A protein has these predicted regions:
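Rossmann-like NAD(P)(H) cofactor-binding subdomain of soluble oxidoreductases
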Residues: 1-74, 78
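Short beta->alpha linker loops
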Residues: 13, 38-41, 104, 147, ...
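Mobile late-domain/C-terminal helix-loop "cap" segments
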Residues: 156-167, 171-173
Length: 173
């Protein structure tokens, strides 16, 4: 019933149960746009599973999408029409940087974009812990560390300078 009333379907389940979840509604997906965020399900795998003619694109998001600052790797091979893809970009571009990649790059891009928030949180925690060790309050240390990460990322994005140049531009190591 939900699928019948929807223009888009966004499967967001663990890979092991995707076939069980979508199987019963496969015929209803033919006139929908399927935007998958299921890990390990690329264009070729969906083509073999979905009803012929179903329009779909595979993506891998990351958790900062929750605040409109995410990264969304999307497989450049898809069968959305030009208008559907423009609608996809318009919709998801509001919450993420959309990075089209080839099928061969889809796994690594998903890992980089999808897993890096966890590594960054660990780094943020370590920076904060170091600040606490040397006398800063935990709140101040985490706030400073978070702003340094944001600022450095924005400096890179806005300047276009290689990260090594940014690193070398710091006066003290």
């Amino acid at each position: 019933d939900v699928v019948a009333k929807s223009d888009w379907v966004v499967p967001a389940v663990v890979p092991a149960i995707l076939e069980d979840v979508l199987g019963p509604v496969l015929p209803a997906l033919r006139d929908k746009i399927v935007v998958s965020i299921v890990s390990g399900w690329d264009f070729a795998r969906y083509e073999a599973f979905l009803a012929p003619g179903t329009h779909h694109i595979s993506t891998i998001p990351n958790t900062p999408i929750a605040i409109g600052e995410g990264v969304l790797a999307c497989e450049s091979t898809h069968n959305l029409t030009e208008a559907e893809y423009a609608q996809f970009e318009e919709t998801f571009g509001k919450i993420a940087l959309i990075v089209p990649v080839t099928a061969a790059q889809f796994g690594p891009a998903g890992t980089l974009g999808g897993c890096t928030p966890a590594f960054t949180a660990m780094y943020l925690e370590a920076l904060g812990d170091a600040g606490v060790k040397y006398g800063l309050s935990r709140a101040a240390a985490y706030q400073m560390a978070a702003q340094v990460l944001i600022g450095t990322g924005m400096l890179y994005l806005e300047s276009g300078l290689h990260p090594g140049v940014l690193k070398d531009g710091v006066c003290s190591p």
